[in-house]
């Protein structure tokens, strides 16, 4: 039986381990922390639970592709309850409130009541969300998709919908917010994530929520990780906690590999053979070396190419991201949790 070492016990690492076990591989996940889950985590503080990750979960709608995957890895189960909120989130400014409701028409009407002068941008935003919702909830078969679009009764024509779609590409949240005149409407877009984030992330996330594909699993982040960990272990997978990996061991012998491409279909110059080396194990920080047939890095990409492997192994596509900080900025984030004496609405 071939052996796979997986570095990192987060959602990616647990998923890789589960699918590898189902495929018949021997697997060991090495996780540096005392609990699995990675960023999908939470803490108990003074009688409160602080969830670090899942504010909504893409793939909660039955029948969606992601829902099937979540069930395969044990993140969701048929017996698990889903928390279905009425609103995605609520923003407040100067004593006024506005929400992104599951009912998008309610969102539209409340936005229009607050700022009639923003009617054009409000309709553009809501219609785009409805369009994205329709596309995301369809099977995306060409005939079905065209039929669905023909049945739409938006306030915009098809040509205008295409124009609206193009208008959102390349915008960040701050640029989207500044399209609106009313400060409260500006705030609801800026309260989602950092202002530098691409605007389409909000549009997609909200459309997932509207379609019932972005609800919250009961138990939150820790519950999802617990179910996935139990699924992995029930399949016979090994999980080593508090065991950081220091380095991936590379075999010195060079291999000559034919490109995995059908050269007859390419109208380019002759492709050269690939010169590569095999990774055949890892060295742990405790000094122990472990051999394996395959290594999967399911950890931070920066740690992978600056610690586990030499910088010379960084692919050109990733090197471009590292060297161009203007077009590919990196953000830091922090989370603040407040203890409130009283009941809160959504």
PLM features per residue range, with description:
Residues 44, 92, 240, 283-284:
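A general beta-strand register signal
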Residues 92-111, 115-118, 132-133, 233-234, ...:
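Feature captures the FAD/FMN-dependent oxidoreductase FAD-binding
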Residues 2-134:
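N-terminal glycine-rich phosphate/pyrophosphate-binding loop and immediately adjacent elements
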Residues 7, 30, 242, 297-299:
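Generic beta-strand/beta-sheet core signal
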Residues 216, 246-346:
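Mid-domain catalytic core of redox enzymes
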Residues 130-235, 242:
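Active-site/ligand-binding neighborhood in enzyme catalytic cores
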């Amino acid at each position: 039986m071939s052996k796979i070492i997986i570095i990192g016990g987060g959602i990616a690492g647990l998923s890789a381990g589960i699918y590898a076990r189902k495929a018949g591989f021997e697997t060991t996940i090495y996780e540096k922390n005392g609990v699995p889950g990675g960023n999908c985590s939470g803490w108990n503080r003074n009688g409160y639970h602080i969830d670090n990750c899942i504010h909504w979960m893409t793939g909660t709608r039955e029948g969606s592709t992601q829902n099937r995957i979540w069930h395969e890895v044990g993140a969701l189960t048929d017996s698990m309850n889903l928390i279905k909120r009425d609103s995605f989130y609520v923003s407040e400014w100067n004593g006024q409130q506005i929400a992104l409701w599951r009912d998008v028409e309610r969102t539209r009407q409340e936005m229009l009541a607050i700022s009639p002068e923003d009617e054009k941008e409000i309709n553009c935003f809501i219609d785009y969300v409805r369009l994205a919702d329709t596309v995301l909830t369809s099977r995306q078969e060409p005939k079905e998709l065209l039929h669905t679009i023909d049945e739409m009764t938006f306030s915009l024509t098809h040509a205008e919908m295409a124009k609206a779609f193009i208008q959102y590409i390349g915008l960040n949240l701050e640029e989207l917010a500044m399209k609106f005149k009313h400060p409260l409407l500006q705030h609801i877009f800026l309260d989602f994530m950092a202002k530098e984030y691409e605007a389409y992330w909000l549009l997609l996330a909200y459309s997932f929520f509207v379609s019932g594909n972005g609800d919250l699993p009961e138990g939150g982040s820790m519950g999802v990780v617990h179910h996935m960990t139990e699924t992995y272990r029930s399949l016979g997978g090994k999980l080593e906690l508090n065991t950081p990996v220091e380095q991936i061991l590379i075999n010195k012998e060079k291999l000559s590999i034919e490109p995995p491409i059908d050269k007859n279909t390419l109208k380019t110059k002759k492709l050269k053979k690939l010169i590569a080396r095999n990774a055949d194990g890892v060295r742990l920080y405790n000094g122990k070396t472990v051999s394996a047939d395959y290594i999967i890095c399911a950890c931070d990409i920066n740690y992978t190419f600056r610690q586990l492997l030499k910088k010379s192994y960084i692919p050109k596509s990733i090197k471009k991201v590292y060297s161009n900080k203007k077009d590919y900025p990196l953000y830091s984030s922090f989370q603040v949790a407040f203890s409130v004496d009283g009941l809160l609405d959504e």
